[in-house]
């Protein structure tokens, strides 16, 4: 039975099946048409949680058989694929969270389904991505590093043409936030598909995170939003996964539609992020950053409650610390 047949007919794939799939997808010598058929077929099936763990571990082990660890490190990112074309919320959040002293290792990529991915924005900001080897030095100095997925996982470049061809979210959107080169203590992940929240939360637990939040934003975003109830799966330090809804209005933030968070080109997104960090933008765009930064600070144990996290995020923008972090990352 071929791998394609097994993908189409088997309810649960073996770890060996998943390794075979990954080996094909990352091979430079196998044609795009074969990869397209396998990846599109796999993304249409009901993915089992253990399979996601197999995929993530297979990719990590291929590049980092002895995965490096930085105690207390955190990643804040979304899966992408929500088609919202929002500005780079999680990248903006990273400056705020790092300015609180959280060690943030943000693992990002160029855009697949939107106008401007994290790496596109960093290029516009004149902020260099960091190599995996140099990450500890920069974290010690600046509390923040941006690692480009194509640099940390050069094997991923062999998947990019296929992902572009498919033109919609695939299993790799779920995998992206989970393959940070570093073993993390904390993580916050936004997921485009609410049916995948539990699956991602359990996989994050398998990966050994101490605390995490996996969320799906109200009305379909992969960030917490201001437009209604956000779905939350929280991994606690005792290994429990609890789920609940969170509405920004319960924390003193005004209701706002997701359309308020529309971004544009890297140049336009730079202007949006900078105006939030320098305090000029007091609109709902600022509030959505405060909400996501507040959640991140809560996960990273900088505060005891989400409300305190939002309050701390507000202070870090208002007192200029978040903007200072931006300038520090630019080498100014």
Curated annotation (Swiss-Prot):
GO terms for biological process: L-tryptophan biosynthetic process. Gene3D superfamilies: Nucleoside phosphorylase/phosphoribosyltransferase catalytic domain. Mg(2+) 1 binds at residues 90, 223. The keyword Metal-binding applies. Pathway: Amino-acid biosynthesis; L-tryptophan biosynthesis; L-tryptophan from chorismate: step 2/5. It catalyses: N-(5-phospho-beta-D-ribosyl)anthranilate + diphosphate = 5-phospho-alpha-D-ribose 1-diphosphate + anthranilate. Pfam families: Glycos_transf_3 (PF00591). Mg(2+) 2 binds at residues 222-223. Anthranilate 1 binds at residues 78, 109. Its cofactor is Mg(2+). Binds 2 magnesium ions per monomer. GO terms for cellular component: cytosol. InterPro entries: Anthranilate_Pribosyl_Tfrase (IPR005940), Glycosyl_Trfase_fam3 (IPR000312), Nuc_phospho_transferase (IPR035902). GO terms for molecular function: anthranilate phosphoribosyltransferase activity; magnesium ion binding. 5-phospho-alpha-D-ribose 1-diphosphate binds at residues 78, 81-82, 86, 88-91, 106-114, 118. Keywords: Amino-acid biosynthesis, Aromatic amino acid biosynthesis, Glycosyltransferase, Magnesium, Metal-binding, Transferase, Tryptophan biosynthesis. Anthranilate 2 binds at residue 163. Belongs to the anthranilate phosphoribosyltransferase family. PANTHER family: ANTHRANILATE PHOSPHORIBOSYLTRANSFERASE. Homodimer. Catalyzes the transfer of the phosphoribosyl group of 5-phosphorylribose-1-pyrophosphate (PRPP) to anthranilate to yield N-(5'-phosphoribosyl)-anthranilate (PRA). This is Anthranilate phosphoribosyltransferase. It comes from Staphylococcus aureus (strain JH9). The gene is trpD.
């Amino acid at each position: 039975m071929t791998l394609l047949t097994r993908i189409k007919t088997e309810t649960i794939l073996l770890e060996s099946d998943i390794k075979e799939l990954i080996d094909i997808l990352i091979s430079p010598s196998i044609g795009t048409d074969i990869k397209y058929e396998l990846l599109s077929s796999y993304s249409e099936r009901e993915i089992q949680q253990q399979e996601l763990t197999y995929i993530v571990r297979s990719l990590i082990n291929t590049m980092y058989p002895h995965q490096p660890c930085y105690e207390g490190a955190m990643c804040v990112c979304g899966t992408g694929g929500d088609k919202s074309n929002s500005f780079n919320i999680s990248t903006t959040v990273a400056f705020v969270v790092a300015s609180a002293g959280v060690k943030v290792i943000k693992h990002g990529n160029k855009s697949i389904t939107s106008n401007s991915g994290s790496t596109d924005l960093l290029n516009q900001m004149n902020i260099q991505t960091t190599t995996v080897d140099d990450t500890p030095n920069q974290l010690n100095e600046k509390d923040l590093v941006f690692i480009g997925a194509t640099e940390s996982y050069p094997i991923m470049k062999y998947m990019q043409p296929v992902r572009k061809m498919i033109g919609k979210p695939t299993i790799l959107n779920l995998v992206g936030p989970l393959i940070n080169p570093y073993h993390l203590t904390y993580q916050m992940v936004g997921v485009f598909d609410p049916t995948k929240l539990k699956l991602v939360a359990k996989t994050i637990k398998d990966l050994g995170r101490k605390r995490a939040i996996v969320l799906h934003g109200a009305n379909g975003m992969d960030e917490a939003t201001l437009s209604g109830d956000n779905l939350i799966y929280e991994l606690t330090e005792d290994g429990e996964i609890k789920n609940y809804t969170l509405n920004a209005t319960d924390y003193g933030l005004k209701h706002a539609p997701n359309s308020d968070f529309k971004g544009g080109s890297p140049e336009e997104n730079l202007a949006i992020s900078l105006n939030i960090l320098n305090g000029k933008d007091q609109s709902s765009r600022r509030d959505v950053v405060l909400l996501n930064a507040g959640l991140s600070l809560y996960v990273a144990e900088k505060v005891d409650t989400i409300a305190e996290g939002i309050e701390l995020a507000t202070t870090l923008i208002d007192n200029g610390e978040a903007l200072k972090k931006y300038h520090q990352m630019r080498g100014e």
